[in-house]
């Protein structure tokens, strides 16, 4: 899949994890923006032009605002892309109940950590055809 020029918002509070994700995604041709917590992600999304972000990749466990609350906040915004932008969350907890909580928050995909970049890129490609 050609991921060139897709714009992804990566939300991760761990600096090393964020750097690794950005490096890998940029190497795959994606255009990457970053936020360090859910609140910052919501604010960036609100300020962006509609459909500016093709996809959001977000950690669940973050200070200030976690990934689930951020996803709910984004889904609740009154703009055309708020309900359609694919949101993928990353979590060390991939139990059925966690995945259900993600679905309830309007999240499209729940990926387990540690991150396998090949898998992440496949998932991104599946949403951004």
Task: Annotate each predicted stretch with a short phrase.
Residues 1-129:
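C-terminal compact regulatory domains
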